[in-house]
Design a protein with these regions (language model features):
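Short secondary-structure boundary/capping segments
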Residues: 80-84, 107-117, 185-191
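Thiamine diphosphate
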Residues: 44-107, 144, 150-167
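Glycine/aspartate-rich loop-and-adjacent alpha/beta segment that forms the canonical ThDP
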Residues: 156-192
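N-terminal leader/propeptide and maturation segments of large enzyme subunits in energy/redox metabolism
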Residues: 1-51
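Conserved thiamine diphosphate
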Residues: 2-10, 58-60, 115-165
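Glycine-rich loops and low-complexity Gly/Arg-rich segments
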Residues: 90-93, 117-121, 169-171
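Short C-terminal domain-edge/linker segments immediately following a structured domain
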Residues: 96-99, 122-127, 176
Length: 192
């Protein structure tokens, strides 16, 4: 806005306005940023322009993703996940859901399903899993998707693209096989 206020160059004003208008649209902002940088580099007329150009790699809208496991999202880090989703900021959360505590030996967790047999739940887990997706949907502005990563790569990519395009927070809960599932033939038989 400072550049627009201090120039009579209509092309420069238009480039600045296009950048401002597209700032929340990642794809459109890439082109607007490229055009703005080209315009500013053509004539460095003041310290403000020089300062902007010195930080040009930070001009375009950034994609923000948080990746974590189900132990983090459903249990120890749930308060933080909920806080991020409640903020209504444009951030994407991707949860790798193995439905057990994979890093500590496959114990039942809040992501484990009722009746699921796991370490310390040999007779089956007695309580149902936390409804993380449903909890996120109660905000009304969170994009939520549940996928099985290895089952359908197109669906996985579609969910990621939709989450990225969503203006606001998104949550993808991705079922992910792990060694604790004792898949016949091992993890080499998993399509991820």
């Amino acid at each position: 806005k400072a550049v627009m206020a201090n120039t009579a160059d209509e092309d420069r004003k238009a480039a600045c306005q296009a950048w401002l208008d597209t700032y929340n649209d990642g794809e459109a902002n890439k082109a607007a940023t490229k055009a703005l940088v080209a315009n500013l580099e053509a004539k460095v007329c003041c310290d403000t322009v020089a300062d902007i150009l010195s930080k040009k790699e930070y001009l375009s809208k950034k994609s923000v993703w948080i990746f974590g496991g189900d132990g983090w999202a459903y249990d120890i880090g749930f308060g933080g996940v909920d806080h991020v989703l409640a903020s209504n900021k444009d951030v994407n959360v991707f949860v790798f859901d193995t439905e057990v505590y994979s890093n500590t030996g496959g114990q039942a967790s809040k992501a484990s399903n009722i009746g699921q047999v796991a370490q310390f739940a040999a007779a089956g887990k007695e309580t149902k899993s936390k409804a993380l997706a449903e909890m996120a949907m109660t905000y009304g502005y969170v994009y939520v998707a549940q996928i099985a990563m290895g089952a359908n790569q197109l669906q996985t990519m579609k969910a990621i693209a939709e989450a990225e395009a969503h203006k606001g927070p998104s949550l993808i809960i991705a079922y992910a096989p792990c060694e604790m599932h004792s898949i016949k033939g091992g993890m080499t038989n998993c399509q991820l």
